[in-house]
């Protein structure tokens, strides 16, 4: 029997919603929130009644009867580290989302709003593969400095979705494949997927791995320390140089990779150097992950917005095809990925996990 799901994906200035019947999209909407509307609230949690009302009003305008829903799936927020999968929203999760235990982010509202609507309909609410998915093997956590442990923050939802898609298209289960997945968007994450777990991945938020349109990636540590103590920058300014104002935008003044590629291929040497350096760093990170998988790699999957670039994907392929075949799944579809996570539970393919 077909299942109907409402998907809620809150961002800082908008809330994306979608209604699906199984994997078929019935409709989707991006509900934009002005700075004035958001500015009324002193923190993210306070926005939840406002955003919930906007969602319900749009569903009403569309003439959609929410009583026909079987489940609601929200974007997973900044929770305590968890293994990948679909989690039923429970009291422990709601408490951590409300209190922003790992930080404030609009995605914290996905589970809260989903639960509130689901409760009134007596149906389950889920979250799927939040950014805090942490399946690193113990050896991967060692950094070389006891005070600092490597942690896992990356594009878990899209990484897991395309890995499962690759497995399905090759008539295998996700638990039976070894692949390297490369997400190239505003940030870059390269993950080693082994038997259904991402056993190593760069921290895509916090200055590790390849640079990206607006993040620095890993930089020489001694020089960074000296920059921190140069007296020229505050703590917040240094953090912004790592995440937000680093990478391509720091070198070229733009975070639009289409513009970077256009100018590079039109003969601008500086743009070409930065574009090729991005390709070089991504390829090097793929090589590292292939070693983590001990050379046993079924495929290298390129995904995210930058994977639409023929030049970038071709150049990466030229560098890494000796490791494994390269597969392209450009872009990302978070609404569908969240839907699929909910359906796996509703169809009995897997059990909902419990957040503790």
Curated annotation (Swiss-Prot):
<comment type="similarity">
    <text>Belongs to the acetokinase family.</text>
</comment>
<keyword id="KW-0418">Kinase</keyword>
<dbReference type="GO" id="GO:0006083">
    <property type="term" value="P:acetate metabolic process"/>
</dbReference>
<keyword id="KW-0808">Transferase</keyword>
<dbReference type="GO" id="GO:0047761">
    <property type="term" value="F:butyrate kinase activity"/>
</dbReference>
<dbReference type="InterPro" id="IPR011245">
    <property type="entry name" value="Butyrate_kin"/>
</dbReference>
<comment type="pathway">
    <text>Lipid metabolism; butanoate metabolism.</text>
</comment>
<protein>
    <recommendedName>
        <fullName>Butyrate kinase</fullName>
        <ecNumber>2.7.2.7</ecNumber>
    </recommendedName>
</protein>
<dbReference type="GO" id="GO:0005524">
    <property type="term" value="F:ATP binding"/>
</dbReference>
<dbReference type="GO" id="GO:0019605">
    <property type="term" value="P:butyrate metabolic process"/>
</dbReference>
<keyword id="KW-0547">Nucleotide-binding</keyword>
<comment type="function">
    <text>Catalyzes the conversion of butyryl-CoA through butyryl phosphate to butyrate.</text>
</comment>
<dbReference type="InterPro" id="IPR023865">
    <property type="entry name" value="Aliphatic_acid_kinase_CS"/>
</dbReference>
<dbReference type="Pfam" id="PF00871">
    <property type="entry name" value="Acetate_kinase"/>
</dbReference>
<keyword id="KW-0963">Cytoplasm</keyword>
<keyword id="KW-0067">ATP-binding</keyword>
<dbReference type="InterPro" id="IPR043129">
    <property type="entry name" value="ATPase_NBD"/>
</dbReference>
<dbReference type="GO" id="GO:0005737">
    <property type="term" value="C:cytoplasm"/>
</dbReference>
<dbReference type="InterPro" id="IPR000890">
    <property type="entry name" value="Aliphatic_acid_kin_short-chain"/>
</dbReference>
<dbReference type="GO" id="GO:0008776">
    <property type="term" value="F:acetate kinase activity"/>
</dbReference>
């Amino acid at each position: 029997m077909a299942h109907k799901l409402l998907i809620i994906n809150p961002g800082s200035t908008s809330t994306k919603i979608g209604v699906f019947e199984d994997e078929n999209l019935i409709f989707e909407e991006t509900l934009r929130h002005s700075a004035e509307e958001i500015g009324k609230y002193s923190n993210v949690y306070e926005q939840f009644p406002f955003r919930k009302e906007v969602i319900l009003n749009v569903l009403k305008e569309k003439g959609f009867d929410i009583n026909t829903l079987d489940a609601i799936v929200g974007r997973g927020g900044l929770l305590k580290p968890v293994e990948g999968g679909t989690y039923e929203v429970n009291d422990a999760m709601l408490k951590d989302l409300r209190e922003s235990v790992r930080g404030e982010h609009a995605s914290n509202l996905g589970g809260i709003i989903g639960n509130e609507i689901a409760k009134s309909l007596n149906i389950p609410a889920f979250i799927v593969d939040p950014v805090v998915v942490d399946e690193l093997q113990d050896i991967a956590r060692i950094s070389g400095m006891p005070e600092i442990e490597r942690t896992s923050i990356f594009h878990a939802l899209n990484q897991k979705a395309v890995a499962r898609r690759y497995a399905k298209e090759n008539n295998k289960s996700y638990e039976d494949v070894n692949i390297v997945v490369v997400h190239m968007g505003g940030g870059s994450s390269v993950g080693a997927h082994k038997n259904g777990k991402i056993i190593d991945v760069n921290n895509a938020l916090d200055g590790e791995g390849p640079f990206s349109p607006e993040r620095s990636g890993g930089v020489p540590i001694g020089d960074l320390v000296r920059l921190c103590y140069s007296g020229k920058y505050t703590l917040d300014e240094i953090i912004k140089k790592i995440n937000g104002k680093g990478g391509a935008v720091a070198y070229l003044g733009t975070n639009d990779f289409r513009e970077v590629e256009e100018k590079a291929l039109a003969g601008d040497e500086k743009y070409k150097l930065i574009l090729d350096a991005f390709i070089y760093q991504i390829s090097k990170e793929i090589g590292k992950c292939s070693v983590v998988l001990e050379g046993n790699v079924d495929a290298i999957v390129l995904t995210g917005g930058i994977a639409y670039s023929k030049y970038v994907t071709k150049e990466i392929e030229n560098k890494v095809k000796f490791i494994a075949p390269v597969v392209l799944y450009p872009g990302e579809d978070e609404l569908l990925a969240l839907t699929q996570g909910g359906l796996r539970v509703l169809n009995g393919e897997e059990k909902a996990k419990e957040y503790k």
